[in-house]
């Protein structure tokens, strides 16, 4: 056994991480000890020697960001947060992976103090970090002035082989290199092991050359267990201002475990009591489980240093306030996520007076008109598109493409839908900006897991999804969404708006921007749609997600529709009126929001006992819960076809005549 006093202090700090991780996984009988043990030296060097943070204030705006992209190594992060002084007591490390503990199996933002993003789906943390670094660069260009670098921090990422195998890593890292995100520093845990074994059989990439081709600064072949080599690499990385840096760290998974280090068995299972005991002997670690020696605890404690660093920044910010009061006020507003007073005034003016927004218009074009009105009042809006700007209509006259220097308010993400969605999550997590990005709705499948993560993290992110149905016509079934609206509605805490005209589109944008606790998907048409007149009460009720658009005395049936099919339902109601059948028309642009209303309001719109028919150019099964067993869901339960839109609507029975006929049959059978 090595005597503790003879072991290098930095090595003892790293070993504290190893044992906290191994002991917590052992107690939980669940978890991943190998990666935390293998990255212990990397973590010691980054967190004790480079990371600028204040454990007493995890929300300090100019803190460095740390992202554990290989989120299965969560016990490494929890050990770091506990040791450096965050509000994470040892009792919570003992509760690792237990119900309601703040130490869940994978890191979750807003659950554990100091965790910057929720990670676990490999590669997404890396893409989030790209978004954070992009946000830092854009905000620095906006707010910094000579002598006042109030936005000046790095984003550090730990990532593994799995992150780099995910295609998302290509999308995000290619973009990061193109945009020159010089304050993004990634440390690659190159241990050569994944769940199935040695990765050489399925991951033989030359990673340094790959990242050099992206335009990254690459520091290759660093011993991931040599603190001096790691420290030198990090100093070199921080000196690079124009390119992101990848530090390739050769590591041994499960480092320190006498019998299991270097093998895939240590990846995702407890080491076992005998192996941990042998490790204690081999590393000269005499402390009991969940006990940290005083000298190690003192060496890790970052509270005093963190407070001093934030105090220095605060003093600089006070001077900044005096020199640039308007900029300082704007910085505080945006950092706190507050929308400016009256930001919606110009948009509301478009609804109060004759304007193109009130005419026959595609809702994608209506969305662009909304953005034209909103962008001057909301400098925090950061737009973008996955190479479909001219189709999504996500740009406005005030759009300036983001460039290498960090100026602009519009990102050309390229054909990178998943990358765009995950990068936008990182932008939202950073704060100070509200990202929105566009693609065709059928390609939302590429983005889906990042949309899910935004919902889980409760992020204000807006997805502009155009060409929302068979209404796009001749491009055919590869581009015609069918199941997508229903699928997106199934994501908890995700709001899906499918507006029927300019007014509903405006309210959809307002709802998306005012929603601070989750993402919004705006599902928009390619084709022009008929506008509807509304009184003040109806217009206000748009914000409730569903409302009575056209009513009649003593209705016998309720027609419920969204988007382009609202016009079909309204015309069907007229046909039914000619046949002596009174039909109420309900527009339901946001089903989730409607069902969040109180029961009295819902019943006033959809009276119990009245037969219901839903009309939406998409999968019908979602609507069966709305119309009930006695109702009828009209839509499309197959893939589309290549043809003009008018022919497709006729082919699939989505016409006023078909809807009216279905209503008559339903009433006859009732």
From Swiss-Prot:
GO molecular function: metal ion binding; transketolase activity
An annotated GO BP: reductive pentose-phosphate cycle
SUPFAM superfamilies the UniProt entry points to: Thiamin diphosphate-binding fold (THDP-binding) (SSF52518), TK C-terminal domain-like (SSF52922)
Requisite cofactors: Mg(2+); Ca(2+); Mn(2+); Co(2+)
Pathway(s) served: Carbohydrate biosynthesis; Calvin cycle
Cofactor note: Binds 1 Mg(2+) ion per subunit. Can also utilize other divalent metal cations, such as Ca(2+), Mn(2+) and Co(2+). Binds 1 thiamine pyrophosphate per subunit.
Catalysed reaction equations from the record: D-sedoheptulose 7-phosphate + D-glyceraldehyde 3-phosphate = aldehydo-D-ribose 5-phosphate + D-xylulose 5-phosphate
Marked site (Important for catalytic activity) residue numbers: 32, 267
SMART domains according to UniProt: Transket_pyr
Disulfide-linked positions: none
InterPro entries, alphabetized: THDP-binding (IPR029061), Transketo_C/PFOR_II (IPR009014), Transketolase-like_C_2 (IPR055152), Transketolase-like_Pyr-bd (IPR005475), Transketolase_bac-like (IPR005478), Transketolase_BS (IPR020826), Transketolase_CS (IPR049557), Transketolase_fam (IPR033247)
Pfam annotation, one family: Transketolase_N
Keywords assigned by UniProt, alphabetized: Calcium, Calvin cycle, Magnesium, Metal-binding, Plasmid, Thiamine pyrophosphate, Transferase
Protein residues bound to substrate: 32, 267, 364, 391, 467, 475, 526
Binding site for Mg(2+): 161, 191, 193
Binding site for thiamine diphosphate: 72, 120-122, 162, 191, 267, 443
GO annotation, cellular component aspect: cytosol
Similarity comment: family membership: Belongs to the transketolase family.
Subunit structure: Homodimer.
Name of the featured protein: Transketolase, plasmid
Gene: cbbTP
């Amino acid at each position: 056994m090595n005597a503790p006093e003879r072991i290098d202090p930095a090595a003892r700090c790293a070993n504290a991480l190893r044992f906290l991780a191994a002991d917590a996984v052992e107690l939980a009988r669940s978890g991943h000890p190998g990666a935390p043990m293998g990255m212990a030296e990397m973590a010691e060097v980054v967190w004790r020697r480079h990371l600028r943070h204040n454990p007493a204030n995890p929300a300090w705006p100019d803190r460095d960001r740390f992202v554990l992209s290989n989120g299965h190594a969560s016990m490494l992060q929890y050990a770091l947060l506990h040791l450096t002084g965050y509000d994470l007591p040892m009792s919570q490390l003992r509760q690792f992976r237990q119900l309601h503990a703040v130490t869940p199996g994978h890191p979750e933002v807003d659950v554990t103090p100091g965790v910057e993003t929720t990670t676990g789906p490999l590669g997404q943390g890396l893409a989030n970090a790209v978004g954070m670094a992009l946000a830092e660069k854009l905000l620095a260009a906006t707010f910094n002035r000579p002598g006042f670098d109030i936005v000046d921090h790095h984003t550090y990422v730990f990532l593994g082989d799995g992150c780099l195998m995910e295609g998302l890593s290509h999308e995000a890292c290619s973009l990061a290199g193109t945009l020159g995100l010089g304050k993004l520093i990634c440390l690659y845990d190159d241990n050569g092991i994944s769940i199935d074994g040695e990765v050489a059989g399925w991951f033989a990439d030359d990673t340094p050359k790959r990242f050099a081709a992206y335009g990254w600064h690459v520091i290759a072949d660093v011993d991931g267990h040599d603190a001096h080599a790691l420290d030198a690499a990090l100093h070199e990385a921080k000196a690079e201002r124009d390119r992101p840096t990848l530090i390739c760290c050769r590591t041994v998974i499960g480092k320190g475990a006498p019998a299991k280090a270097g093998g895939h068995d240590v990846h995702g299972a407890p080491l076992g009591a005998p192996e941990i005991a042998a490790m204690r002997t081999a590393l000269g670690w005499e402390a009991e489980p969940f006990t940290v020696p005083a000298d190690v605890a003192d060496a890790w404690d970052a509270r005093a240093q963190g407070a001093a660093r934030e105090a220095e920044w605060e003093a600089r910010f006070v001077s900044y306030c005096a020199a640039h009061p308007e900029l300082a006020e704007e910085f505080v507003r945006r950092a706190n996520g507050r929308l400016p007073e009256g930001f919606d005034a110009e948009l509301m003016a478009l609804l109060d007076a004759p304007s193109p927004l009130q005419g026959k218009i595609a809702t994608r074009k209506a969305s662009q008109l909304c953005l034209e009105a909103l962008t001057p009042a909301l400098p925090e809006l950061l737009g973008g598109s996955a190479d479909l700007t001219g189709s999504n209509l996500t740009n406005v006259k005030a759009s300036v493409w983001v460039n290498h220097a960090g100026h602009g308010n519009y990102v050309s993400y390229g054909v990178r839908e998943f990358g765009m969605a995950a990068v936008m999550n990182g932008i939202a997590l950073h704060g100070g900006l509200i990202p929105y990005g566009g693609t065709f709705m059928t390609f939302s499948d590429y983005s889906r897991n990042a949309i899910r993560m935004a919902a889980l993290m409760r992020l204000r992110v807006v997805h502009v999804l155009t060409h929302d149905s068979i209404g796009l016509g001749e491009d055919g079934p590869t581009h015609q969404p069918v199941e997508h609206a229903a699928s997106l509605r199934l994501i908890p805490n995700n709001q899906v708006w499918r507006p029927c005209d300019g007014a509903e589109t405006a309210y959809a944008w307002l709802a998306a921007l005012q929603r601070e606790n989750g993402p919004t998907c705006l599902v928009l048409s390619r084709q022009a749609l008929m506008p509807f007149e509304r009184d003040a009460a109806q217009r206000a009720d748009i914000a409730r997600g569903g409302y009575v658009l056209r009513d009649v005395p003593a209705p016998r049936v309720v027609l419920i529709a969204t988007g382009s099919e609202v016009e079909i339902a309204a015309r069907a109601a007229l046909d039914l009126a000619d046949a002596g059948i009174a039909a109420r028309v309900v527009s339901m642009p946001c089903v989730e929001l409607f069902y969040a209303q109180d029961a009295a309001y819902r019943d006033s719109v959809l009276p119990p006992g009245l037969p219901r028919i839903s009309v939406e150019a998409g999968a019908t099964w979602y609507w069966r819960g709305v119309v009930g067993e006695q109702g009828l869901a009209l839509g499309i339960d197959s893939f589309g076809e290549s043809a003009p839109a008018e022919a497709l609507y006729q082919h699939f029975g989505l016409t006023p005549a078909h809807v009216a006929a279905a209503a008559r049959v339903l009433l006859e059978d009732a």
